[in-house]
Amino acid sequence: MLTIGCVGIGLWLVGIILSDRFTATQFCSWIPAIAMTPLCLLAAAAARSRRLTTCWCLIAAMTAGWWFLVDQPWRPGEGSSDGLTLMQWTMSHDKSDRVTHADYIVETDADITILTHGYGVRGTDEIRNWLGPDAKPYKLGFFTVLTRLPVRQLRPLAAGMDIHARIIEIDTTRQLGRPIRIAAVDLPSKLTRSRWEIARTLRTWLDERDAGRIDIALGDFNMRRGSAALASIFPDLTHAWDRAGHGWGPTWNRRFPLYRIDHVLVADWLGVLDCTTHDPGIGWHLTQHVVLDGPREVDAAED
């Protein structure tokens, strides 16, 4: 048991230090700190000296502390709902219960809703009635865009090697002081695919295809929050959860969410008033809800 504990802690530390920069270490980076806590306690129980028992108990406390203080899967409190609301949902591939999906979207009533694998939901009467006669659902590759705000641009950016990215520009001048450009992203989930190579490929495409200014990047990245690969794709954006997260943070899988693989990254000029996840009651992913505000200089000018 002591050997297993040492190996487990060693692999976990490798994942913390090297993250997913290498294919071999990315497996280690998926080890949740909280999984190490019971392992360390078992090692403490198996230790043959008081000193070793104390040592393993301290390591167990450290892993639990890391989980709650660094990984921060839970944050108390509530944010403000007075702002531009954005929902991202990586939907299931199941098309058999479109009305249930649509009802959840309508009930949420976000200003901007971006779906991955939206498929038949966008054609339901529930969605069309909710949007009203002056708006329509937009299909953009893997993605569905639902909003009553003026959509200024829908642009394909990347689609190959199971890497999908699209640019969406929406006129939010009244709400945020300027339009926002959103990069909707869906990246491979295969565990053996190098996350670092995926990130490098997407970053290269963004540069070569002149993606322009990106204010928000969102979607199913299949990378953990804090991933080195994730940070390398959009180095100028920060995680909305880091700025204003509340409640339970992980988004997958829905029944027992342990990992945050769906992300909303935002530019510094945007104010983040709240970032939460919610259980839609269907599918594999929790939904992400973000409340945004404009920059301070815009607010000051309006006053």
Segments (PLM) and residue ranges:
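N-terminal, active-site-proximal structural segment of metallo-dependent hydrolase catalytic domains
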Residues: 1-127, 296-298
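Soluble catalytic domains of enzymes that build or remodel membrane lipids, polysaccharides, and related
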Residues: 86, 92-106, 117-303
